[in-house]
Amino acid sequence: MVLMVNLGFVIAEFNRDITYMMEKVAEEHAEFLGATVKYKIVVPGVFDMPLAVKKLLEKDDVDAVVTIGCVIEGETEHDEIVVHNAARKIADLALQYDKPVTLGISGPGMTRLQAQERVDYGKRAVEAAVKMVKRLKALEE
């Protein structure tokens, strides 16, 4: 029996030129893996992701959530604060809802050029989400 995996995407619009490319690569890889992207929520930035992740995790037809974002280094340590806090809360939500949430977030501490070179983080996050859903389902059998 083939397991269908339903995904929700949470995408940051900050640095949208990069997150758009990440989103497209992630969508293509989901299709390649036979997964369905059921929902997409675009949020202002990475720091805003946890609430949208929570809303998707509450849906019965979502097996996993993929986060897609890009945090570029600025003059202060703001990029580190944003990524570390968002990642911690996103991990907490995965445990709270007992569903995988994967980090397709590049940064902190990178330049725009480095961010463009890391567009495949979206693909990696989809790969991890699908693998986690399948492996966790196998544990239940």
UniProtKB/Swiss-Prot annotation:
Binding-site residues, (2S)-2-hydroxy-3-oxobutyl phosphate: 75-76, 118
Keyword line: Riboflavin biosynthesis, Transferase
Record's GO cellular component terms: cytoplasm; riboflavin synthase complex
Reaction(s) catalysed by this chain's protein: (2S)-2-hydroxy-3-oxobutyl phosphate + 5-amino-6-(D-ribitylamino)uracil = 6,7-dimethyl-8-(1-D-ribityl)lumazine + phosphate + 2 H2O + H(+)
EC assignment: 2.5.1.78
Biochemical pathway: Cofactor biosynthesis; riboflavin biosynthesis; riboflavin from 2-hydroxy-3-oxobutyl phosphate and 5-amino-6-(D-ribitylamino)uracil: step 1/2
Binding positions (5-amino-6-(D-ribitylamino)uracil): 14, 46-48, 70-72, 103
GO MF annotations, alphabetized: 6,7-dimethyl-8-ribityllumazine synthase activity
GO BP term, pick one: riboflavin biosynthetic process
Keyword Mitochondrion belongs to the record: no
Catalytic machinery residues: 78 (proton donor)
Domain of life of the native organism: Archaea
Any one Pfam family match given in the protein's UniProt record, by short name: DMRL_synthase
SUPFAM superfamilies: Lumazine synthase (SSF52121)
Subunit (UniProt): Forms an icosahedral capsid composed of 60 subunits, arranged as a dodecamer of pentamers.
Role summary: Catalyzes the formation of 6,7-dimethyl-8-ribityllumazine by condensation of 5-amino-6-(D-ribitylamino)uracil with 3,4-dihydroxy-2-butanone 4-phosphate. This is the penultimate step in the biosynthesis of riboflavin.
Family (UniProt): Belongs to the DMRL synthase family.
UniProt xrefs under HAMAP family: Lumazine_synth (MF_00178)
Annotated protein name in UniProt: 6,7-dimethyl-8-ribityllumazine synthase
